[in-house]
Amino acid sequence: MRRRPRRRRILPYLLGALALVLALSFGVRALRYRLAHENLPGSGIAAPDFVTVDYLPANEYSRPGTPLEEISGVVIHYVGNPGTSAAANRSFFANLALTHETYASAHFLVGLDGEILQCVPLTEIAYCSNTATDYTVSIEVCHGDETGEFSETTMESLEALVAWLCETFSLDPAEDVIRHYDVTGKVCPKYYVENEDAWLSFKQDVSARIEEDKTANGEAS
């Protein structure tokens, strides 16, 4: 009968040891992640104020944690679900960890009201651009109807985001900003595939914004 208290005294030690093991395991994983991502092009770069950072949980289907070792382009997509919000599309990506439906994500989502969500760090790949996944930043853009055309509010935010990425990673909008279509031939983003002039105009607008930013910052063009 007197042995039971001893067992009760041992239990806290066992629980403490288990907690220590778990803490050490978490610390080792965190250290491995930091070492794998600390010298990448996107490391140490904070999102601009107009971007809301809301990372997906780490998982095999939408945020595998694979290092993005090169950033030499930006790929524009459209979500393909008319009327859906940036938050709804982020939820779809996050839920893939449970549904295992497909592999999909994007670094950024631009919404119908111009909101921008960052879903994946710039030190990691996003499952979005097929063979270009390993060296590009991907942007999914929401649209109001089947035409795939983006609203003026959405466009304003998209231009600002792409200009910031080009400035940050020394990219040329004319050459380094591409459509999903340019990678695989998929009709994405639909409006810009079916309206080439609008696509070229968008890239020119991004270039113009970059020049405006340089002028505002007192930099030579």
Predicted regions and their residues:
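N-terminal catalytic cores of peptidoglycan-degrading enzymes
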Residues: 1-129, 221
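Basic/polar, cationic surfaces and motifs that engage anionic cell-wall
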Residues: 2, 12, 16, 29-52, ...
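Soluble periplasmic/extracytoplasmic beta-strand elements of cell-envelope proteins
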Residues: 75, 109, 138-140, 178
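Cell-envelope and extracellular/periplasmic
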Residues: 80, 132, 137-146
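Glycine/serine-rich loop-strand microenvironments at binding/catalytic pocket rims
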Residues: 116-137, 203-214
